[in-house]
Amino acid sequence: MIALPQDRMDQLLKRFSMIESQMANNPDSDTYVKLASEYSELQDVVGKIRELSDARMEASDLAAMRDDASTDAEMRALAVEELPEVEKRIAVLEQDVQILLLPKDAADDKNAILEIRAGTGGLEAALFAGDLFRMYERYAAEKGWRVELVSASEGDAGGYKEIITTVSGKGVFSKLKFESGVHRVQRVPETEAGGRIHTSAATVAVLPEAEDIDIEIRNEDIRIDTMRASGAGGQHVNTTDSAVRITHIPTGIMVVQAEKSQHQNRARAMQILRARLYDMERQKAESERSQARRSQVGSGDRSERIRTYNFPQGRVTDHRINLTLYKLDRVMEGDLDELVDALISDHQTALLAELGEQP
């Protein structure tokens, strides 16, 4: 168990009390909004710290009662019986406080851009990309999130060669951020007469949606080209130059949007470009912060195989945490909480281990 930073906990309690006092003094609306936001951020950890303090005091009182020679036998027996239970509660609360004191990912509360692309496997890969999209769409619906289509390229036999959407709601990125990587499927395609199992894959990228304040894009760093959007067979769907390609010159990142509205295409392309640049900065900072994380919840590398969906065996395996669940049908219907929660827990354990290694 890593020792809890008592000074830090005392500072949080003091700050929380100060916020409560300031909010009670009828500040102006702008100040009140800022105070309310900080109050909300601190509420959970302060509540747990207070619970822990109360439990420790209770344990101290019980220990004193047990060790006091003047305590009558019945009360001493009661103290001996109750103390182990209180100590167990203290251990749980200490773990809770440790997790709440972990460094916060600034992107956790952001919306996300979800990109799914068919990989190896031809037609079957596109079908699987479609299955993954429906899985995330159902998970989002269960969470009360909103999914909006940005662009899609359908597969020749169904599914998607590529689909990009935004996902908006509370805690979206914190839940979806570990989905980035290569997802592999093993199943018998409907067109396979011999019943042979085929393996194909799709790549998922989850990017935190960035605001202007998160990432600066200078006008001189981008090149915007317009062209005619093409429909099936390469025919122009209209006579105006509506498709937009934006190139970020310093990084070479290119985004193309080809819907009917040039204005909407430009806005969407900038939205995706901003998210990709912000994600690039986050990945760089994370890599510099700790190489040790690479052995925990994967490297975050988009080319890393993270999960296998085996249909004949009805199982899904997350290779980063060696977790196998035999409920593939439910997972494909959007029942992802067990996988998502296990990944978050593993990430928190790794962060706690890092804190324990610090001098």
UniProtKB/Swiss-Prot annotation:
Gene3D superfamilies: 3.30.160.20, 3.30.70.1660, 6.10.140.1950
Modifications after synthesis and translation: Methylated by PrmC. Methylation increases the termination efficiency of RF1.
Protein localization: Cytoplasm
Entries under Pfam families matching the protein: PCRF, RF-1
Region (Disordered), start-end ranges: 283-309
One term under GO cellular component: cytoplasm
Domain of life: Bacteria
Entry-annotated residues carrying N5-methylglutamine: 235
PROSITE patterns in the cross-refs: RF_PROK_I (PS00745)
MF GO annotations: translation release factor activity, codon specific
Keywords, in A-Z order: Cytoplasm, Methylation, Protein biosynthesis
The keyword 4Fe-4S belongs to this UniProt entry's keyword annotation: no
InterPro entries attached to this UniProt entry: PCRF (IPR005139), Pep_chain_release_fac_I (IPR000352), Pep_chain_release_fac_I_sf (IPR045853), Prokaryotic/Mito_RF (IPR050057), RF-1 (IPR004373)
Listed PANTHER family: LD18447P (PTHR43804:SF7)
Similarity-based family: Belongs to the prokaryotic/mitochondrial release factor family.
Its biological purpose: Peptide chain release factor 1 directs the termination of translation in response to the peptide chain termination codons UAG and UAA.
Protein name per the record: Peptide chain release factor 1
Encoding gene, per UniProt annotation: prfA
